[in-house]
């Protein structure tokens, strides 16, 4: 009879106890392996698995689990990776993984992080809460609201919310809603760009300026402050204004030497000239560092100066080379023209005429001729 009643109830749509257990615990008969170091996450995941009807195992020797839940950093990569990802075949990555994750990869078992598992459980519980049976749920057909009822909750639930109609936008107006004016402060600094800061209206009610301003533009000045400003302004107009001198305390002289670790008696410069101070400063490495900085700066300046001289010399040499090449071209052209002119003169058998009469004979022949003529006259 009991079995018949259960069969009839299921056929009519009435859920029995067995169905409720199966629906309330969807992970019955499935095992999970936990590798979570964080105790809070481990307890949360264990409670979720216990509620859903799953069993928790300690190792792969008991049975092959449905999923391995781990908070190891490699679990995030394995969770996002696909089946054909080369990450599963990389030996270096497998050596880095812990033993449980390595066995899960080798056995093709899913790996999930605790956060994702808990999110999936929460979404599943939300769906279960929203979905109800057609036989057990209340009727979705609601009648007209009766305002005479005493229960105000039902009246608020059933009464429709009236939304005020917005006036249509006319052709003259761009928008029917008045635009909210934005408040801003402009800060003019001499020699710089003006700085504009937007301020919400909720942060203040009144902005003060001029003499009424206190130590802040959002606070009014007190009567004593206003009177003092008026007095100072009147004395400024008369030429008797003297700014108030602020009292301050001179800084005390630092008579402690960090290198020697003792107080200095006398002048600090005299102490710094002593051999004791110099040796300690040199051994602590400050002198070498300073010398290295100065030497590097000096070498850098010398290199820059040498590079500048080299560039100037190259530029001068290039200019001289250009001038020499131009002059050589001119001389070459002039020489060619002169050879052509001489060749034309020789071809025409022309002899250059000179105004002065010169002897064709050489000086030695001229002397021999003169001797021979003088000897003939004597005979």
Curated annotation (Swiss-Prot):
Composition bias type Polar residues, residue spans: 128-141
Disordered, as annotated region: 1-25, 128-158, 355-379
Domain of life where this protein originates: Eukaryota
Protein name from the UniProt record: Uncharacterized protein F55H2.7
Organism lineage: Eukaryota, Metazoa, Ecdysozoa, Nematoda, Chromadorea
